């Protein structure tokens, strides 16, 4: 089945559900899959691509790669972080280049001989996907090994509030807010951040 055919089948299934014929969503198309199965496959593929995007973002952070970091955003993407709100992929890349220079000044003398000192992790990913738009929330934390004993410590944690958009078949962040629990002004409020 072509992409158009799959999309058409999903639209038909949704229309039939809205119209009240729920059993129609479970009928098989000529390719052998029920329309509900096609919708589930589309969701699974979108979710996998979004989780891959999140992983690429984390690797870019840890290896301080400003261009790879910025490439996870749409051209008009917005980064809302502790340093302020930055709009546009080019401005995000410039901002991250500045962060990289600031962090480089803090590195110890043996830093060039060592791998990246931070490792960022993401978990508890909650996503709502609606066509070519999605919203997401997830926990993040970072482990730092830059202590005198090089023993790892959790040095930061929080959650992301994300808006995503599919551009030319690929998911990208259109807006990412980084909530940081070690900073009172960026900490989560009393309400559950999940939907």
Each PLM stretch: what is its role?
Residues 25-38, 109-195:
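A beta-strand edge to alpha-helix "cap/lid" segment located at domain peripheries
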Residues 66-140:
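A solvent-exposed, acidic/Ser-Thr-rich amphipathic alpha-helical stretch
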Residues 11, 22-25:
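Cleavable N-terminal signal peptides
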Residues 8-17:
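Bacterial N-terminal signal peptides
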Residues 1-9:
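Bacterial N-terminal signal peptides that target proteins for export
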Residues 24-59, 63, 67, 71-75:
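Short, low-complexity N-terminal intrinsically disordered segments enriched in polar/charged residues
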Residues 45, 84-87, 152:
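A structural signal for alpha-helical segments
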